[in-house]
């Protein structure tokens, strides 16, 4: 009898959920969890209504408003009629189809990829989808999670399955100890800088190595969150005691004997020794600096001690022209020190860096300091429960005393779909995940950084090396 072939974590979860495979490789995958928000769901629910279908498994579906909700006073009407309409539609659709829904006044409300793990809806070994590209966040728990389009949202609502083709396996190993001031955000920005925004195309990434194991669950979520910016379908980290401890006792997590049974399965969720990966890359955590993006792609990364690069040094013409356009859009000149770049706005929040650990890191920097007079700085907790925890720890008082605005939970300035957005040519230090043209507002200029780096920039009025912060 032959031994079982060593298998990757991705392959294990895929195989456990494979319902059917056609000759051309097209597969039908069972979906365990479906997260829904107000932007990509209205047409999907309308499709069900038109066809006379029900939601196949409402108990496996969780809806929340996040993209369009104002982060200021919610007792006032939403200033954008289209946003208000989408929010009202989600409330009505959830009621009509029997789906659990967290509205903007529910303390469980927040960014969809913050509330999933927080509620214990996200579990190891599950397949999770959402009409949102940053669904890869949930891979921090060893779940196979990725974004889907609106037509696929309807398909999952109706059938609890998804049609797709299997991806390849890539392992990203990060070993060594992170230096002081260097965070999970810097790890993932460094990875994207290494592989480029297309480097992960066609792959599911598994993050491994001692530096990844050393991260908290919040840090692991930050890493997995930006897998899509590296071009990957999803990102995974094998679950361990940190993941189990995070989930135990959460409202929607298994209890009692069900927990014990789940644990027996979860403990098998790791890539076997000798499992084949189609591609491997390695990074040394000890060599990583605090990172800032300088251009209009998440791959445009540079050390805080660096200078804006010169596109003239790039041999490939298409790439050179692309980087010249990025510099023109960002209003930067080659050779400018990163620490000489002044900012107008600062945003701490999003599904990348809106969790309690992120707010603690920012508060440590902000305590006893004052936001620069030329900077508007907002802090948006990732959920109502994160906000509640931060306030219990007095973090809100630290921020407010320093001149930061303390807001209600939501996607906020991560994307220009709500009142929190940049004006043309405003420059923002942001803890979000995308620095594309117009992402935070028409002609807005975004630099991606860690929470501590963002807070320090807001206080100094320009980017500073957090390793030298006093």
Curated annotation (Swiss-Prot):
GO molecular function: 3-isopropylmalate dehydratase activity; 4 iron, 4 sulfur cluster binding; metal ion binding
Enzyme Commission number(s): 4.2.1.33
Reaction equation(s) it catalyzes: (2R,3S)-3-isopropylmalate = (2S)-2-isopropylmalate
One example of a Gene Ontology biological process annotation: L-leucine biosynthetic process
Principal EC category: lyase
Binding site for [4Fe-4S] cluster: 351, 411, 414
Cofactor note: Binds 1 [4Fe-4S] cluster per subunit.
Matches recorded under Gene3D superfamilies: Aconitase, domain 3
Top-rank taxon: Bacteria
Subunit structure: Heterodimer of LeuC and LeuD.
PANTHER family linked to this entry: 3-ISOPROPYLMALATE DEHYDRATASE, HOMOACONITASE, MITOCHONDRIAL-RELATED
Function, in words: Catalyzes the isomerization between 2-isopropylmalate and 3-isopropylmalate, via the formation of 2-isopropylmaleate.
Name of the protein this chain belongs to: 3-isopropylmalate dehydratase large subunit
Natural source organism: Rhodopseudomonas palustris (strain BisA53)
């Amino acid at each position: 009898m032959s031994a079982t072939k060593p298998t990757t974590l991705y392959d294990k979860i895929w195989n456990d959920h494979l319902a059917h495979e056609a000759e051309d490789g097209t597969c039908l995958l069972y979906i365990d969890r479906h997260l829904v928000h107000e932007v990509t769901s209205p047409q999907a629910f309308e499709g069900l209504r038109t066809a006379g279908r029900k939601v196949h498994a409402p108990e496996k579906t969780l809806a929340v408003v996040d993209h369009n909700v104002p982060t200021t006073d919610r007792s006032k009407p939403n200033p954008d009629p289209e946003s208000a309409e989408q929010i009202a539609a989600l409330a009505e659709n959830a009621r009509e189809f029997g789906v659990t829904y967290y509205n903007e006044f529910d303390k469980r409300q927040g960014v969809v990829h913050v509330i999933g793990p927080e509620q214990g809806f996200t579990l190891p070994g599950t397949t999770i989808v959402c009409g949102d590209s940053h669904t890869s966040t949930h891979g921090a728990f060893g779940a196979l999670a990725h974004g889907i389009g609106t037509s696929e949202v309807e398909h999952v609502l109706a059938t609890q399955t998804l049609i797709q083709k299997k991806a390849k396996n890539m392992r990203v190993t990060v070993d060594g100890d992170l230096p002081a001031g260097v965070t999970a955000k810097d790890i993932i920005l460094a990875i994207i800088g290494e592989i480029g925004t297309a480097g992960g195309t066609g792959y599911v990434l598994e993050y491994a190595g001692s530096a990844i194991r050393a991260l908290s669950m919040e840090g692991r979520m930050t890493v997995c969150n930006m897998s899509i910016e590296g071009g990957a379908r999803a990102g995974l980290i094998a679950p361990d005691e940190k993941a189990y401890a995070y989930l135990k006792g959460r409202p929607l997590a298994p209890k009692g004997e069900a927990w014990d049974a789940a644990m027996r399965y979860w403990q098998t969720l790791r890539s076997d020794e000798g499992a084949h990966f189609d591609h491997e890359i390695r990074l040394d955590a000890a060599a990583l600096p605090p990172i800032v993006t300088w251009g209009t792609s998440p791959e445009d990364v540079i050390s805080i001690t660096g200078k804006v690069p010169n596109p003239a040094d790039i041999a490939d013409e298409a790439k050179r022209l692309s980087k010249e356009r990025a510099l023109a859009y960002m209003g930067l000149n080659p050779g400018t020190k990163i620490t000489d770049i002044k900012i107008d706005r600062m945003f701490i929040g999003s599904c990348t860096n809106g969790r309690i650990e992120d707010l603690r890191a920012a508060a440590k920097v902000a305590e006893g300091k004052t936001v620069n007079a030329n900077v508007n700085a907002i802090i948006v907790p990732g959920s109502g429960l994160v906000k509640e925890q931060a306030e219990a720890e007095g973090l809100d008082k630290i921020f407010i005393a320093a001149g930061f605005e303390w807001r209600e939970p939501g996607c906020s300035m991560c994307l220009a779909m709500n009142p929190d957005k940049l004006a043309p040519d405003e420059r923002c230090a942001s803890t979000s995940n995308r620095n594309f043209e117009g992402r935070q507002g028409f002609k807005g200029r975004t630099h991606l950084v860690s929470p501590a780096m963002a807070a320090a920039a807001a206080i100094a009025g320009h980017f500073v090396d957090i390793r030298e912060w006093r």
